[in-house]
Design a protein with these regions (language model features):
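Long, compositionally biased intrinsically disordered regions
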Residues: 22-27, 244-334, 341, 430, ...
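Low-complexity, highly charged intrinsically disordered N-terminal segments
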Residues: 44-99
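N-terminal catalytic cores of NTP/NDP-binding nucleotidyl/phosphoryl-transfer enzymes
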Residues: 115-150
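Glycine-rich phosphate/pyrophosphate-binding loops
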Residues: 132-133, 146-170, 395
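Short, conserved secondary-structure transition motifs
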Residues: 162-174, 266, 402-415
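A structural-propensity feature for long, helix-poor, extended segments
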Residues: 174-179, 406-435
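A glycine-rich helix N-cap at a beta->alpha junction
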Residues: 179-205
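A translation/RNA-centric and nucleic-acid-associated enzymatic feature enriched
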Residues: 298-368, 374-385, 394-396, 401, ...
Length: 561
């Protein structure tokens, strides 16, 4: 759907077909973009595909459709809710004292005081060095959509926001990074919230190894220096992430929000208290989850208490045992009154899980759109009734953009093998089979023979049934047995012929391993640094130029010669 009728629709079509030309003196390449439906990739869940197609089975689980009218409706709802804009601006201004702040960011922060300014939010944990490519993609999607809405709805202002989930304690997930297929893992003795951990020698050793890999590229030195300026020994991971994202996107006016903040969390004390002592969120979300589970796999189930206790080097669950509230796997415990006092005096010591994090985000931000991945959208679809219970506006949900980046060498192999954009999502075996079948001079299919044999068996069955009707089943069994033998013969014929196509097999394996590392989507494995090292700032520009807004399609970007 277009943003403002036919003119905007035409704009989006032209955007989809455009070529993004690299202007760097050191690069003469250009890039082409192709879009295919998410369903054709085979990498997205049923709930995501159904959400994109506005399937009836999901329409009761979200508030607004992902289109321009949905944005307008979300704005109307948001205006009825009292966001503490003054507090938000104060905390952002305080936060940005730690980094160099662009004029555009300063302007956007100030604009948040205005009741007609709204945020376009995306969120992620502070994975080391940003983790996976989609970290970058979701941020650029938020920036692009905010820019588009500022053009199409000039009566309002839209500001892109990146919400850092710095309280996540899953170091195994957040502490790994892949560079050109090589996995690096951060081994540290630190525990608790990853955002509060500090850059140490072990992490800097990883960065040194990555430097050795990337410094040979045209922009390798530039991207390594960019990361090194932020990941300084002794700095927290949260602040390092903030620094890097700010350096990459400050010129786009992206606001980075660090929600691990005492004053912002005070806004949530009533909800946190409700969760701990009445278990209201758990009851509401459980009901919704049961309804959703009738059609889909549920992404996240609530606990009785959906808060962690966050202090020093721990982030552990709060568990009620009769009249005592214990912090799991520690010796810390509270009575009800003691825990109430702790929450009132130290709200920063209470960390929401995935169920309450969304409420916190939408309470402190004047937000109208949340951009997330498939997993994020799946759990947001469990939360609509929870939002309604607390009278917090539920945003428009938009699936983040997805990309597959194909460098010049791999693109050359794809063209050599005459593969289409859809072909590259097929398995190695299927691709090899198609190439062999298409190029062989021999007959590998026994379809005609099977048809002839089938006719013989049908006639035989008629004949034998005239003698004894029970023999018909025996003929069927013989036919099935023979057809299985013929199927096996076809497999052997194909296998024998494949030997003549060893070169093409190697090329296909090279293509697949490059584009689908660990048999997964590139964006869910690889880091942004190798692509920045090769293409420089144009990497960001190419993604921005080919990012769609509401039009949900998977984008394949090819580097041309």
């Amino acid at each position: 759907m277009g943003l403002t009728g036919n003119s905007a629709y035409t704009f989006c079509i032209l955007l989809s077909l455009r070529l993004c030309v690299i202007n760097k003196n050191t690069l003469s390449n250009s890039f082409s973009a192709t879009y295919i439906p998410y369903e054709q990739t085979g990498y997205f869940s049923k709930i995501v595909i159904d959400y994109l197609s506005q399937n009836n089975s999901l329409q009761n689980f979200y508030q607004h459709p992902a289109n321009l009218q949905g944005i307008k409706d979300a704005i109307t709802s948001r205006k009825k809710f009292s966001t503490n804009r003054k507090l938000l601006v104060e905390q952002l201004e305080q936060q940005y004292l730690a980094v160099e702040t662009s004029d555009k960011i300063k302007h956007n922060i100030t604009a948040l005081k205005d009741e007609n300014t709204f945020t376009i939010c995306t969120a992620h944990q502070p994975n080391i060095f940003t983790g996976h490519l989609y970290f970058i993609y979701k941020i650029i999607h938020a920036i692009k959509l905010a820019d588009t809405l500022n053009r199409d709805l000039p009566e309002n202002k839209f500001v892109p926001v990146f919400y850092v989930g710095s309280e996540d304690a899953d170091l195994e997930e957040l502490g790994e990074v892949f560079i050109n297929g090589e996995k690096y893992e951060w081994h540290t003795q630190q525990t608790g919230a990853v955002g509060r951990m500090k850059v140490d020698d072990e992490l800097l050793k990883i960065l040194k190894k990555i430097k050795g890999q990337l410094v040979v590229e045209s922009f390798g030195k530039e991207v390594i220096e960019l990361v090194q300026e932020c990941y300084v020994k002794g700095r927290t991971i949260q602040d390092a992430c903030f620094c890097l994202v700010n350096k990459l996107f400050a010129d786009h006016g992206l606001i980075v929000l660090l929600p691990d903040n005492t004053k912002l969390k005070k806004e949530m004390v009533p909800v946190f208290e409700d969760d701990i002592f009445l278990n209201t969120p758990s009851e509401i979300v459980n009901t919704t989850s049961e309804q959703l589970a009738e059609h889909y796999k549920v992404q996240a189930y609530p606990r009785e208490i959906n808060l962690f206790y966050l202090k020093d080097n721990i982030r552990n669950r709060i568990v009620q045992q009769k009249d005592i509230y214990k912090i799991q796997d520690t010796g810390i415990q509270f009575t009800k009154e003691e825990l109430k006092n702790e929450l009132t005096q130290y709200p920063e010591r209470f960390s929401p899980n995935v169920i309450l994090r969304a409420l916190y985000q939408e309470t402190i931000l004047p937000n109208v759109v949340f951009i997330g991945g498939g997993g994020e959208l799946a759990y947001w679809l469990e939360l609509k009734d929870l939002f309604q219970h607390y009278n917090i506006p539920y945003p428009v949900l938009i699936l983040r953009n997805s990309f597959l980046l194909i460098n010049e060498k791999i693109n050359s192999l794809i063209q050599k093998l005459s593969l289409t954009s859809q072909d590259i999502f097929k398995s190695d075996n299927e691709l090899i089979k198609n190439i062999v079948t298409k190029n062989t001079t021999h007959q590998l299919s026994l379809a005609n023979e099977k048809q002839q044999i089938g006719s013989v068996y049908r006639e035989m069955k008629i004949s034998v049934k005239e003698i004894d009707t029970t023999l018909g089943k025996h003929v069927d069994a013989l036919r099935v047995k023979l057809f299985k033998t013929l199927d096996n013969l076809e497999i052997k014929l194909l296998k024998a012929e494949k030997i003549k196509f060893e070169s093409q097999q190697r090329q296909i394996k090279k293509i697949r391993s490059n584009l689908f590392p660990n048999n997964g989507l590139q964006e869910r494995v690889e880091n942004f640094m190798p692509f920045y090292a090769k293409w420089g700032k144009e990497f960001i520009k190419v993604i921005y130029d080919n990012s769609l807004n509401f039009e949900q399609q998977f984008c394949i970007i090819k580097e041309e010669e």
